[in-house]
UniProtKB/Swiss-Prot annotation:
Residues 425-435 have a biased composition (Low complexity). The keyword Membrane does not apply. One of its GO terms (cellular component) is nucleolus. It comes from the Eukaryota. Residues 485-501 have a biased composition (Basic residues). This is WD repeat-containing protein JIP5. PANTHER family: UTP15 U3 SMALL NUCLEOLAR RNA-ASSOCIATED PROTEIN 15 FAMILY MEMBER, WD REPEAT-CONTAINING PROTEIN JIP5.
Length: 525
């Protein structure tokens, strides 16, 4: 009886987690995808591959949605349910280096997707790519150490400059443009930050060896501080600095002098690789999260400890890595993160748990995640890019189910105030591949995905029904895996128990009537 109740709770949790959104557009490549970026104001996506080619595509979201609905209606008429699952019903486009235009498919009157331009932008792989604040300019840096500025609608190069590095083994790893001021930042494999004017492409400042000589994994603006202050991630540390100031003076400060004022402030060693980061709400800058190599999001609060150390952590996917993260920009305390297991997770940082899962691929990781100009999620790996449909949330029923289920298992809503709070809040999704109770808890989802077939099904992304079916398989395996720690779980999980009232015996009843408590006063003693 207990097992059935537990299975029902697990199934309810999985149903809430499975996203209602499905892809409306997919790009596939015959060469490894190196970078992808969405235009901030138009339905345009730019993809760069390992050969140095860059593709700029414009899409019509409404036309793509009509194609999706039309194909879904056709598939619904099929009697064979297996055929329904194995069919792809969104738009698929193959982008190849030798193609010049995109040809219309049979029965397609107007193109839902248009190839604006394609060019070989660099000799060798593209290492970084970014739009300016209004999307009119596109900046790219290649393995050839050439930085180029181009018109994003035509692809025509407006300016280029060669930026040689001190070592031939050193390469640029990250390109970020300021959204408010005319400068851009380049990070390299030796932990250096190069600041350039984005009009003239002239070098303005260099901040050297920030993360003990390790590569720059991510750069983003320090929200709430000066527009010139940024945060960088590298190896096992987080650092923040002013892009206008050099850190040459830091070299003369002894390492054990903790009171000295430095140009670069570095966090404590996190003993885990810090891969990506983002502020939860880019408007206030109260909380930021960092994706880690061990499959967790670490939560940081600048106003609490000046980014000396993480405040708490949110387990996402055990034995995997969180490779990319971005704010939902919906003022809902949520972020989207992509993981090496091919899933995209929507995480409520305040509650400290995953609230939605999307399956990008079963054989490829999610290396990039972005939002288009209408806040559609775009996920990308080494071989494909998927643009996801917007789900109309006309009611909050799903959120209420999720929240009430969490409250039944937990006493606290504040997922980022302490480790204990985070673990308690995320108890409700412990049956899925979200490992939210503790770092040592079993992760049935990640383990089951490790045994998936090496050949992906014709269906490259999963619908909600198929995702549920796939997650349900985890329940059977997790039941067997959980037998050996059932006793430990029962003993460690807090439960609210009703206290049973004991019946009073005759002596207690008599003392109660006489207002005595078993202790008598002895006069004159």
């Amino acid at each position: 009886m207990g097992k059935n109740t537990k299975a029902k709770k697990r199934a309810a949790s999985l149903e809430v987690l499975a996203s209602k959104s499905s892809p409306i557009l997919e790009f596939v490549f015959d060469e490894p995808l190196i970078h992808v970026a969405c235009h901030p104001e138009q339905p345009i996506v730019v993809c760069a591959i390992a050969t140095g080619h860059v593709f700029c595509c414009k899409y019509d979201a409404k036309a793509l949605k009509r194609i999706l609905n039309k194909n879904e209606a056709k598939l619904a008429a099929l009697e064979n349910k297996d055929d329904q699952k194995r069919k792809r019903f969104w738009k698929l486009i193959k982008l190849k280096a030798e193609m010049d235009t995109y040809e219309l498919e049979e029965g397609e009157e107007t193109a839902a997707v248009e190839l604006l331009w394609k060019t070989r932008r660099h000799k060798g792989s593209v290492r970084g790519m970014s739009f300016n604040n209004d999307g009119s300019k596109l900046y790219t840096i290649g393995i050839d150490n050439v930085l180029k500025k181009a018109n994003s609608l035509t692809g025509k190069v407006m300016k280029k400059v060669t930026l040689p590095l001190s070592s031939e083994k050193n390469h640029y790893t990250k390109l970020v443009t300021s959204k408010t001021h005319p400068f851009l930042l380049l990070g390299d494999e030796l932990g250096n930050i190069h600041v350039l004017n984005n009009d003239t492409l002239q070098l303005q400042n260099t901040i050297k060896s920030i993360h003990n000589g390790d590569a720059i994994n991510d750069i983003f603006q320090f929200v709430g501080k000066s527009v010139y202050k940024f945060i960088s991630l590298g190896q096992t540390t987080l650092a923040y600095w002013d892009s206008r100031e050099s850190n040459e003076s830091d070299a003369s400060i002894p390492a054990d002098d903790l009171d000295a004022k430095r140009k670069v402030y570095v966090s404590d060693d996190q003993e885990d690789e810090m891969i990506c980061g983002s502020f939860v709400n880019p408007e206030d800058g109260d909380i930021l999260v960092c994706g880690m190599g061990e499959g967790v999001l670490t939560v940081w609060k600048p106003k609490k400890n000046d980014l000396v150390d993480q405040v708490t952590r949110i387990p996402i996917c055990k034995n995997e890595s969180v490779d990319c993260v971005i704010s939902s920009f919906q003022d809902d305390n949520c972020v989207y993160c992509g993981c090496s297991n091919g899933n995209v997770y929507k995480v409520n940082v305040k509650l400290g748990k995953v609230i939605e899962i999307r399956k990008h691929s079963s054989i490829d990781e999610v290396s990039f995640i972005d939002l288009d100009y209408e806040y559609r999620v775009l996920s990308a790996g080494m071989d494909k890019v998927k643009l996801w449909d917007i789900v109309d949330e006309d009611d909050d029923e799903e959120g209420k189910i999720n929240e009430s289920y969490s409250n039944s298992e937990s006493d606290n809503d504040n997922g980022f105030d302490s480790d204990a709070d985070s673990n308690s809040d995320s108890e409700s999704v412990s049956s899925s591949d979200v490992d939210s109770a503790s770092d040592d808890e079993e992760n049935s989802k990640s383990e089951s995905e490790a045994n998936e077939s090496d050949v992906e099904e014709t269906l490259v992304g999963l619908s909600k029904d198929e995702l549920l079916a796939e997650l349900e398989k985890d329940l059977q395996s997790s039941d067997e895996d959980s037998k050996h720690y059932t006793k430990r779980t029962k003993s460690t999980q807090p439960k609210k128990l009703k206290k049973q009232k004991k019946e009073l015996n005759n002596k207690q009843l008599r003392n109660l009537q006489k207002h005595e408590h078993g202790i008598r006063k002895f006069e004159g003693l």
